[in-house]
């Protein structure tokens, strides 16, 4: 009887050791790049869209959810956005998609924002695809460069950058139109 108990104890211990040996390594594995379409040649796509930040009127596309600490620099303010992306400067031109995300006042001594947004395309070849922009926007500079840190759909594994140029701003209500020239590397 003692031999049977000893034998069972050794078996249980052995099973416990074997079953726990791979616990830390089973969550990740090397994959074939072809399974994700990464065997294709990488492409560089350039496109230009116009971002309409509307703070005024009955249907604003930018809503301040946290007011600034002071009025002088916008520091500490956070605004959520669902801004139209159009093919041309006028807001009534063809809508290509939406810029969805937020911007936050991140500079104390200048008008500087942390931008975190997805450009979600809703028409044509890129319908359902997105690019993700995360970067610093010094809004009073003529040209602002921000990185593209990812994407989805046809922009899966995207990287690149955007150049933002303000085309129009209403200093009374804050409404603005900004040209985004996008340079995207993707498969």
From Swiss-Prot:
Signal peptide (UniProt feature, chain positions): 1-20
Transmembrane segments: none
Sorted UniProt keywords: Apoplast, Glycoprotein, Secreted, Signal
Its job: Dirigent proteins impart stereoselectivity on the phenoxy radical-coupling reaction, yielding optically active lignans from two molecules of coniferyl alcohol in the biosynthesis of lignans, flavonolignans, and alkaloids and thus plays a central role in plant secondary metabolism.
Organism superkingdom: Eukaryota
Name of the protein described by the UniProt record: Dirigent protein 20
Family (UniProt): Belongs to the plant dirigent protein family.
Gene from which this protein is expressed: DIR20
Record's subunit section: Homodimer.
Glycosylation sites: 71, 92, 127
Subcellular location: Secreted, Extracellular space, Apoplast
Pfam families reported in the protein's UniProt record: Dirigent
Family matches, as InterPro entries: Allene_oxi_cyc_Dirigent, Dirigent
GO BP, one annotated term: phenylpropanoid biosynthetic process
Annotated Gene Ontology cellular component terms: apoplast
Disulfide bonds: none
């Amino acid at each position: 009887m003692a031999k049977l108990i000893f034998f069972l104890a050794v078996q249980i211990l052995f099973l416990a050791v074997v079953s726990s040996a791979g616990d830390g390594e089973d969550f990740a594995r090397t994959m074939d790049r072809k399974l994700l379409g990464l065997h294709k040649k990488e492409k560089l796509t350039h496109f230009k869209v116009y971002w309409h930040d509307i703070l005024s009127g009955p249907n604003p596309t930018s809503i301040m959810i946290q007011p600034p600490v002071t009025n002088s620099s916008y520091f500490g303010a956070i605004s959520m956005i669902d801004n139209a992306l159009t093919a041309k400067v006028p807001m009534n031109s063809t809508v290509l998609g939406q810029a969805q995300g937020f911007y936050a006042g991140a500079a104390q001594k200048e008008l500087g924002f942390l931008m975190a947004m997805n450009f979600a395309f809703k028409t044509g070849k890129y319908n359902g695809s997105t690019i993700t922009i995360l970067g610093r926007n010094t809004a009073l500079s003529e040209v602002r460069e921000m990185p593209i840190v990812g994407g989805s759909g046809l922009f899966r594994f995207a990287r690149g950058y955007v150049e933002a140029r303000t085309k129009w701003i209403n200093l009374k209500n804050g409404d603005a139109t900004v040209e985004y020239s996008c340079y995207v590397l993707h498969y």
